[in-house]
Amino acid sequence: MTDATQQYVVGVDYGTLSGRAVVVRADNGDEVGTAVHEYAHGVMDKALQDGTSLPPDWALQHPQDYVDVLRNAVPAALSASGIDPRSVVGIGVDFTACTVVSATADGTPLCELPEFADRPHAYVKLWRHHAAQLHADRINALAEQRGESWLPRYGGRISSEWQFAKALQVFEEDREVYARTDRFIEATDWITWQLCGAETRNTCTAGYKGIHQDGAYPSAEFLDALSPGFGDFVAAKLEHPLSPLGARAGGLTDEAAGWTGLPAGIAVCVGNVDAHVTVPAAQAIAPGQLVAIMGTSTCHVMNGTVLAEVPGMCGVVDGGITPGYFGYEAGQSGVGDIFAWFVDNLVPASYADEAAARRISIHEHLTQLGADQPVGGHGLVALDWHSGNRSILVDHRLSGLVIGTTLATTAPEIYRALLEATAFGTRKIIETFEASGVPVTELVVAGGLLKNATLMQIYADVTGRPLSLIVSEQGPALGSAMHAAVAAGVFPDIVGASVAMGSIRRGVYQPEPVRAKAYDRLYEHYSALHDHFGDGAMMRSLRAIKNAAVST
């Protein structure tokens, strides 16, 4: 039986392949029900559903999948919780970013209009859509040439994953889709629109992905110089008053109440981003606590008290994570995806058979086989750029590399080298923060990869820092629920919600001095490879050769 006076909130976390809903007690953060709904369309990176082929580096989604999460995961989570839905007082969502929707003035996605069903640019561009790299290069070159004040806030480079590069690609490659797009909007804001019936824009995505700094987007003059006719993009398709994180976007509409089984009129929170929303769930709001949300990729987010310009970062935004602090973001484009790529493509079948016999996953089997090897015993160093480099090089045309293989090298050894490479990438990010005057005192890990104890110890040894772990297995969804509690008035601010509803296990992994010293030697080689191949000349050339070959 549940207390009839107890209040609950719902958080919905939209990932790359599925959406997760969690029902949470608003007073203490207890998660009483959860459910997951897989996207029917998944990620379209080779072709649309009708067979229309896609060029290299594309990644699209269908927005109906997002609504289906509300129709399926939320009612299922409510059912699993056993609570009276009338005790729910708020709902909040978070999303991968930058994932953007091209929509009409009333919020209808262009891909849902019959005349645009076969037009790739009418679909949602997922965060890992990297086909706008050339457009990002032009933005960076012009901004540097003109001395635009916002460029250093993003480490000196704008990513191909972000709003302006993606919008410029649409403008130049499908002018009809661009012309029909009234609102170019982050998916987290779009799904919030569907919940409350009103368009809102959040400060987080506007700052980190939309180049909104010091109260303004890039000027019309800059955009028109970038591509004639593109100058009205902000005024015509993007600009809207920004809402702080934790604010109430509106009340749940009757239609959305029908989808979700929640009471109409309850608070709908302003949208958020999956990584940033996790910070209060991990009780890591204090400056210097670097939160690494480790899954298919890793996003590093941290609050600070000073405004600093850090090379190769993803951005610094006033209030971008927590009101009252400067929020910093960095990241690695591929982490879990790299491990999955190796297992899916390069591991001999015998290892799969052994794992099946032991009733464990291949990932667990490979990890255990390599766990007892002394540091450096495989003689390998890898670059973790299989999905490009987000920080600190900001170049998604870079590619992965393993050096040191011999005829005696085994699959578990390569797998461990890949684990280590991702840890080296995180160390590179930490060192860059600290060299820029932004201290990192603690590494807090959230996401599915924290279950790999060997990987966590590697990160502690490589970074030389204690590792703390979030308690919740649904960090983003819990964080969204916490912001919903603020929007519903249960707490005055997210700091109070974090104290009451968040949880963390501090110092679970400590660096071992002997292993840490051995990793220092490997890291020197990683850094040498990083700097040598980081100019991108060879890797870009190889990618160009590949793209030309498959396009003919």
Question: What is the meaning of each model-derived region?
Answer:
Residues 1-45, 89-140, 176, 198, ...:
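Glycine/Thr-rich phosphate-binding loops that ligate phosphate moieties of nucleotide
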Residues 1-5, 253-262, 272-289:
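Conserved phosphate-binding catalytic cores of ATP/NTP-utilizing and phosphoryl-transfer enzymes
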Residues 14-16, 103, 141, 145-272, ...:
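Gly/Ser/Thr-rich active-site cleft segment
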Residues 36-83, 126:
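N-terminal phosphate-binding loop and adjacent alpha-helix
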Residues 55-60, 133-158, 288-291, 486-499:
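A polyampholytic, Gly/Pro-enriched intrinsically disordered region
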Residues 67-75, 164-167, 273-277, 335, ...:
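Short, hydrophobic/amphipathic alpha-helical packing segments
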Residues 70-89, 174-177, 222-235, 258-260, ...:
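Phosphate/pyrophosphate-binding loops at sites that engage ATP/ADP/AMP, CoA/4′-phosphopantetheine
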Residues 202-209, 270-271, 276-294, 298, ...:
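Conserved phosphate/anionic-ligand binding catalytic regions in large, soluble enzymes, centered on
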